């Protein structure tokens, strides 16, 4: 793929219940990198970008929560509340969950369902970059809600990209002793800053044994989190966890990927292994509250600023693993 184009378009006009936002910042994301580098989920040509914040410049008929001039952040999805999965309370699996792409643009049309449920006004003291972290943090908040972490538990996070680092911070805030695994020194240093008690460079140590050796009698961790999107890391996480422990598989792998798991161990040692995808309005709201509190700081995640015409360079630098995230800043 590797073909991103900047084109002029008409500024959108909001329909009933819709809002138009003039973006101030857009953050790069691993999903953007997958779309750009190899194609992902959608058939090109299509819009790209889903982590942005900005100012309301137009509101449609019936909009009462927002007005022109409001500083806002809009998540990229909101569930339909009508499909089978929504009625079961599994909102992340909504079959009518449209992804509102197009954050790499000066203006963005926000659909009615998002305006009503997953769009927020920024407090006066909240930076646009801070607000733009709402979407990725909401995925980490939802992910960590799918495992039980008790005070004093030991949790390993495999992969210290943006989401992995957020998992580290959230596990630390839950009172866990956190172990971070990665091969990049600057990411491991940031992991320690965010709360990791131990860091393991997987190029220097065995990723399984080194983690187990940090637990009593090498029994394994209480919770192992996979945040790399590689099938071999799913298998590694399973082997890091103790009997009766939990494995959370967050990172999405390539289509039709399979993993090998010791079924005997899973059965007799009662290991729980769970996949998790996306987020829900409840967890989007929780993420925004955490950002307002300063539990996660944009300065730890957002490294370089680019102009919109340099979006490709921003994405390439992210895809190469040279930064945690980059930021597109728009002219007034």
Functional labels for PLM-detected ranges:
Residues 147, 194-272:
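Glycine-rich cofactor phosphate-binding loops and adjacent beta1-alpha1 units
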Residues 10-11, 43-49, 96-102, 110, ...:
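Short Gly/Pro-enriched turn/cap motifs at secondary-structure boundaries
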Residues 184, 253, 279:
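Residues in the short beta-alpha loop(s) of Rossmann-like NAD(P)-binding domains
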Residues 80-158:
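NAD(P)H dinucleotide-binding glycine-rich loop of Rossmann-like/cofactor-binding domains
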């Amino acid at each position: 793929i590797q073909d991103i184009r900047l084109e002029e378009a008409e500024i959108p006009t909001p329909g009933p219940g819709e809002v138009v936002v003039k973006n101030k910042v857009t953050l790069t994301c691993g999903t953007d990198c997958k779309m750009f580098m190899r194609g992902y989920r959608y058939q090109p040509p299509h819009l790209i970008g889903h982590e942005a914040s900005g100012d309301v410049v137009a509101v449609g008929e019936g909009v009462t929560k927002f007005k022109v001039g409001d500083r806002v952040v809009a998540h990229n999805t909101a569930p339909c509340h009508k499909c089978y999965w929504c009625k079961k309370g599994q909102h992340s699996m909504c079959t009518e969950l449209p992804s509102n792409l197009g954050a790499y643009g000066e203006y963005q049309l926000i659909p009615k369902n998002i305006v009503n449920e997953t769009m927020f006004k920024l407090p006066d003291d909240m930076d646009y970059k801070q607000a733009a972290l709402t979407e990725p943090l909401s995925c980490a908040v939802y992910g960590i809600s799918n495992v039980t972490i008790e005070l004093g538990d030991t949790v390993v996070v495999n992969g210290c990209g943006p989401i992995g680092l957020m998992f580290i911070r959230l596990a630390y805030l839950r009172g866990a002793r956190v172990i971070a695994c990665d091969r990049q020194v600057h990411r491991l240093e940031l992991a320690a800053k965010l709360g990791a008690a131990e860091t393991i460079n997987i190029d220097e140590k065995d990723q399984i044994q080194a983690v187990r050796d940090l637990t009593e009698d090498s029994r394994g961790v209480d919770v192992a989190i996979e945040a790399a999107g590689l099938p071999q890391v799913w298998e590694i996480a399973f082997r890091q966890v103790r009997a009766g422990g939990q494995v959370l598989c967050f990172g999405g792998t390539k289509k039709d990927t399979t993993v090998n798991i010791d079924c005997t161990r899973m059965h007799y040692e009662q290991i729980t292994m769970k996949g998790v995808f996306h987020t829900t309005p409840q967890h989007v709201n929780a993420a925004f509250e955490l950002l307002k509190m300063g539990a996660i700081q944009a300065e730890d995640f957002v490294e370089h600023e680019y102009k919109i015409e340099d979006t490709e360079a921003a994405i390439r630098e992210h895809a190469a693993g040279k930064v945690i995230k980059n930021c597109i800043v728009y002219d007034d």
